[in-house]
Amino acid sequence: MIEVRQLRKRFGDQQVLDGVDLTIEKGETLVIIGRSGGGKSVLLKHIVGLTHPDSGQVLVDGRDIAHLNERALLAVRRKFGMLFQSAALFDSLTVEENIAFVLARERNHTAEEIARRVAEALEMVEMPGVQKKKPAELSGGMRKRVGLARAIIYRPEVIFYDEPTTGLDPVVSDSIDKLIVRVCERLEVTSIVITHDMRSMQAVGRRVAMLHEGRIYTTGTPQEMMAATDPVVSRFVRGISDEKEHAF
């Protein structure tokens, strides 16, 4: 279980997180939504221990990660897999080398074991037989799948998805959403998805948390979010700007 308690973080004059409280249960799929620049990625960095809070706690299985030494923090991070918005593949490496990048550097795995685990990961994301291809040979959706294969090769307990459908057309986005659901069910992992895509939210989410003005504004099911009458929630999920806002 992951528990965030009264988390606060300021950058200069901007209070990005202002008392975030959030509990993420083992095995659930939580979608985090909110305005651009509203602190979703900052919250994610705190959960994985990449950013230190000004105050508050992030508890992973009961341990406050802000007070762990580097070795203990590394052990916690091994529980996590991450699919980045851009897939973050190395263009000069093959698909196999990308997926096995960290695994190969541990030097306690045989080449045969690494090859087997890469093949298993690719099969799980429905991309068998592409080990020798370079990222430039892949479409955007295929790159996302390879990025997910890299995230799951460690067999993590928690997978983070940062805008997994950004830059993809609706058909490919739908296939990625369905893949996320299948991977979650097959691996029985906790999944945390950051997205602005309301179709994706409805497809993958079991519970949704909305971050607004530095705090968790509300939580609920995707259906509850789409049916919300609260103007802050309603405008966001329908993509309607406030009349007081001006876009330039």
Name each model feature, range by range.
Residues 153-157:
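A short, proline-enriched helix->beta-strand linker immediately N-terminal to the Walker B motif
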Residues 134-138, 142:
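Conserved ABC ATPase signature
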Residues 159-162:
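Catalytic Walker B motif of ABC-type/P-loop ATPase nucleotide-binding domains
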Residues 63-64, 111-129:
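Conserved ABC ATPase "signature" region
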Residues 48:
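Helix-to-loop junction immediately C-terminal to a conserved catalytic motif
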